[in-house]
Amino acid sequence: MSGIAALQMYDLPALRQATDALWTGIAVALRARGQGAPESLAREVDPDDIWRDPALLFAQTCGYPYWNRLRGHVRLVATPVYSAPGCEGRRYRSAIIVRTDDPAKGLSDCKGYRPAVNARDSQSGHNALRAAVAPLARGAPFLGCGIETGAHLASADAVAGGAAD
């Protein structure tokens, strides 16, 4: 049996070819060491459902859920290094966005805005926003009621579509 492999965190349509190439390289390396590996990635599975599946071979998670609920159940084998601006070495970057016609010039202008976040256990998609807002909040509510979207792209779509600010 070759197991389940999923790289869903950043498997956006524009990156699909690169994600497949990454998996192909990983699968070839695994097979060269005698480990079975699926030909293709599982894209139609709920990421939360695969973490305790005995067939899980390889998957990608955000660091926050790894440290808070997955550590001890799965083994960390690598941390990707991306070449996006602000992501040099071990660093990563989160973007806080508003609609193109929004007058906000900075985060301090966003008091009362309704955020769209990936999930409450996402470092880049939730906790980074909390950390950025904390100094502005001064112990009082700063942002309005937000929504959880499940993915970075879905959060951007929620802002663009008006479901969030």
Predicted regions and their residues:
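Short, hydrophobic alpha-helical packing/hinge segments within bilobed ligand-binding/sensory domains
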Residues: 45-50, 152-158, 164
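N-terminal hydrophobic or amphipathic helices and topogenic motifs
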Residues: 1-73, 79-83, 87-91
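A generic structural signal for alpha->beta connector loops
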Residues: 35-36, 73-74, 112, 142-143
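Alpha-to-beta junction loops
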Residues: 52-59, 113-114, 160-165
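Bilobed "Venus flytrap"/periplasmic-binding protein-like clamshell domains
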Residues: 5-25, 89-157
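Glycine-rich, phosphate-binding/catalytic loops in enzymes
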Residues: 75-76, 133
